[in-house]
From Swiss-Prot:
Pfam families: Secretin (PF00263), Secretin_N (PF03958). Residues 1-15 form the signal peptide. The keyword Transport applies. GO terms for biological process: protein secretion by the type III secretion system; symbiont-mediated perturbation of host programmed cell death. Keywords: Cell outer membrane, Hypersensitive response elicitation, Membrane, Plasmid, Protein transport, Signal, Translocation, Transport, Virulence. It is found in: Cell outer membrane. It comes from Ralstonia nicotianae (strain ATCC BAA-1114 / GMI1000). Belongs to the bacterial secretin family. T3SS SctC subfamily. Residues 273-284 have a biased composition (Basic and acidic residues). PROSITE patterns: T2SP_D. The gene is sctC. This is Type 3 secretion system secretin. The core secretion machinery of the T3SS is composed of approximately 20 different proteins, including cytoplasmic components, a base, an export apparatus and a needle. This subunit is part of the base, which anchors the injectisome in the bacterial cell envelope. Forms a stable homooligomeric complex.
Amino acid sequence: MAAALLLWTAGTVCAAPIPWQSQKFEYVADRKDIKEVLRDLGASQHVMTSISTQVEGSVTGSFNETPQKFLDRMAGTFGFAWYYDGAVLRVTSANEAQSATIALTRASTAQVKRALTRMGIADSRFPIQYDDDSGSIVVSGPPRLVELVRDIAQVIDRGREDANRTVVRAFPLRYAWATDHRVTVNGQSVNIRGVASILNSMYGGDGPSDSGTAPRAQDRRLDSVAPGEASAGRAGTRALSSLGGGKSPLPPGGTGQYVGNSGPYAPPPSGENRLRSDELDDRGSTPIIRADPRSNSVLVRDRADRMAAHQSLIESLDSRPAVLEISASIIDISENALEQLGVDWRLHNSRFDLQTGNGTNTMLNNPGSLDSVATTAGAAAAIAATPAGGVLSAVIGGGSRYLMARISALQQTDQARITANPKVATLDNTEAVMDNRQNFYVPVAGYQSADLYAISAGVSLRVLPMVVMDGGTVRIRMNVHIEDGQITSQQVGNLPITSQSEIDTQALINEGDSLLIAGYSVEQQSKSVDAVPGLSKIPLVGALFRTDQTTGKRFQRMFLVTPRVITP
């Protein structure tokens, strides 16, 4: 052992270098005890020293060299070993050298080796032997080195044991849904995927679903309606009169970003379906994730060292969504009035005012408008009028209210009507549904029984908003799906014919702007009979005393959709 220590002291490389205060050490000794000499060395260099009582010898001579070279000269001459642990320089005799074998149960030898090197404990003068197959470490050297290596190895091994220990944690959610939700809209199944189901799908534990495959984002139903048999006769009749008494405008399924399959969860997979990652121990199993609907929490059973990753992911999914107000106006304008409105068409938003006209009609005044076009009415009065051409001017405030003001003016002469003006609050990336339909049932005879076949007609407006932050500007992206239809007077086999029109569009607008959708016409017919009582019912000649009059109007239907952020 003494010979080995002499070989160890020959080198000067250590993981934690001694912080010498100077590069020159001058010293003169005459039969001075080696322990006092080493204390003088440490005191002059401001290095704490701990010298074993078993270190013996006397020093005589004059020395002028670096502190490190002087220490190595003394170690080689008197046969002691020194070790610096980062705080104290420890000097021990060769008889105090120790050797230890450390067995690891959980941690790997590579983990211990990296920790010793990173902490500055390993010293190249005292090589440490590692055996990966048996998980063993052999260390020999000064007592302090052996003690530190043993302590660090035990801490790492115990930490790995604690990390591999299976624990169960509950993560309560504040905004997202933990469980899957199923709702029915127009006879079709809507699946809203919860956080627990999303996590299960990431770890390969997506359980079977009782509703089939979830719809894709580009599907017609705007991420909400699962594929299935379409409801019969989805046509349309009258427009939306109000929100009261109809279906709930919002599906109770939660936020729109969690769309997918639902149903019972499958047990954790094994074998090739297990999660593999370079950062996770291959001996670990796939986590078990369940949802607690009572507390709206996600329960995770997994190793303790993975819980931090689960918590970070769940917190990112449980983000606070913005609250938006979707205001929709369904407007019917007669074609004659639409031509007039087209002449005096005025488009507004928060930044510009574009107006065209023939200069004869009264202009909608806006206090914030910068234009002051006027036309002479009579001989004395000057009134604001529409310009004879396109004029670009700035407007303070929103733009949709000016169009609504002109529509309200047309209502006075029965040339326009606002058939519905619903408002609904919804969450960011959650579809808002405004639906008003008429349903009637047609009996269909079967072999042993008769069934009722449902036919629905009406107006359905679905808006899926998403708040987009573009620098400091708030923009709103909308997916809009409109179904508008009516029951016609024509019949086939004593059944009325329904007509239906659909509109699918997307738009990215600034907050406060409106999206105007138009182009479909609606017919309104009325019949009146003027007759002479009694005489009009005489056979053959009764028609001479009766007048039948049928009048009809064609309306152009417009949809004005205005989103607004209530709570960002």
